[in-house]
Amino acid sequence: MPQMQIRDLGPCIIVWNNLEVGKSIGNVKVKFEQATADVQEDQMGLTKVDLVTMGYKSQEVTVPATRLTLSQIETVTHNAVKTNQSVEFFNAAGEDLYDLSEELILKPAQDGAAVADANQWWHFMKAYPITKLDVGYGVKDQRVWDITFTVFPSLGTGSDFGLTHRIGPAIP
């Protein structure tokens, strides 16, 4: 039986802004929820007679990352700055994140490395990471950085306008 182009099972290598984000622990999840609006007619009562699409309610890729380097933490945490042997975190408010977004790529992993076949890669054209840090220190608890990449539609001109993601090689 044929497998999906992006593979049926297995981990992936996560690349954002041309940097490998780090190792994951648990499932990397892709969530797209399409929004719709009901169309009704008085003659049919409360029964909907059609649906109209209204874009996506949410577009997210969630990465439970672990064992991050300081450089990786700086890359995926908004307003974090790496200085010598530390990372400093600064408060920020009012910044537009679309302009800071970059391409996110999920590459299926085989033997601990990304598969070379770009036909199996999943590209998200414009994505920005939001880190939710809930770190526990315990005998059995591994520390995890939950990173949720918000995916935006391309606002460029031409054939990629509105494009959010694609499976296969990058657009030339």
Per-region residue spans from a language model:
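Solvent-exposed edge beta-strands and adjacent loop segments
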Residues: 1-78, 126-144
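Mature extracellular/passenger domains of Gram-negative fimbrial/pilin and adhesin proteins
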Residues: 28-32, 118, 161
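Surface-exposed ligand/attachment interfaces on beta-rich extracellular proteins
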Residues: 42-49, 85-94, 172
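Beta-strand secondary-structure signal
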Residues: 60-64, 103-107, 146-150
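Charged, amphipathic alpha-helical segments
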Residues: 68-94
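Short, cysteine-centered beta-strand-loop-beta hairpins and adjacent loop/turn segments enriched
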Residues: 68-75, 114, 155-159
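Acidic, glycine-rich flexible loop segments
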Residues: 97-137
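Mixed-charge, glycine-accented linear interaction segment located at domain edges/termini
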Residues: 121-172
